[in-house]
């Protein structure tokens, strides 16, 4: 056996992970459950060189050694006279602890313009600590509008097709009410190969669900011209039960339409994360609860998120990823099935900006 039988919380480990050598073969090298802290007995069987099956066990200690994450740069700007919501607005989360202790050291006055040198500190229930030095800039309110004459940069759909379309990719878009009335015949003529449509969202944390005002129009028209459809739901779920309920609600909304592509769980409440009382592990399980329910209903599911949050917050799941990373060449090293590459796309059939996506086809 290994000398130190210790497992990090939520790590993927098997029975054999703690065994340096064995006189035989393990019968079932199963994945150990490391979702709870504390001592855990690992029971297993192995067949020795004489063909005799032997029962064995060992004890591991599941521990949390990961410090909280403070989502904060070198400076933070507020307007003079603002209410003191710093501990609400500055994201402070943890892989295990849903409510790490977060506090700010140093003096500041939100009613007085100036720069204040402060330290944001955090400690989780396992005693892991993190801290960040930052400058709080209290600024005078801005007067008047912007005088910028900078020309708006857009991305032409046809150029994306030219640059990224091949035998292994499809080029499409995602839409919601913000795109207004869409001419799907023009989209198809422009080469749009799929569309991911927002089915709806919730009225904030613990709010009621609502159907996107253009959803029915969009899904009917996409079906009518034969553009393959995927779905996304902008979630405010803070519990697994709510995520499951949301998924069942979505299935009811889409049951009369043709949906061939995955249904995406889209959770982006990072600016108000502290109000959700959820750990990163808990948030990942919320997403899994949603996606499991979608899968059980006969649809494919996937997780939507940006590169930064995929790398720092979300834990791995068995579901595909819809990556958001606005760049010509993503350096995201994880696996992904869809890539939302820009939000300033232009295509005939939509009067304003639209997100352009690349789908990677599994052979």
What are the functions of these language-model segments?
Residues 1-23, 64-98:
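Solvent-exposed, low-complexity, repeat-rich "mucin-like" stalks and linkers
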Residues 17-58, 97-138:
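Serine/threonine-rich, repeat-prone extracellular segments and beta-strand-based repeat modules
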Residues 294, 298-311:
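Aromatic-lined carbohydrate-recognition surfaces of secreted/lumenal glycan-active proteins
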Residues 247-255, 314-323:
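Short, electropositive alpha-helical surface patch
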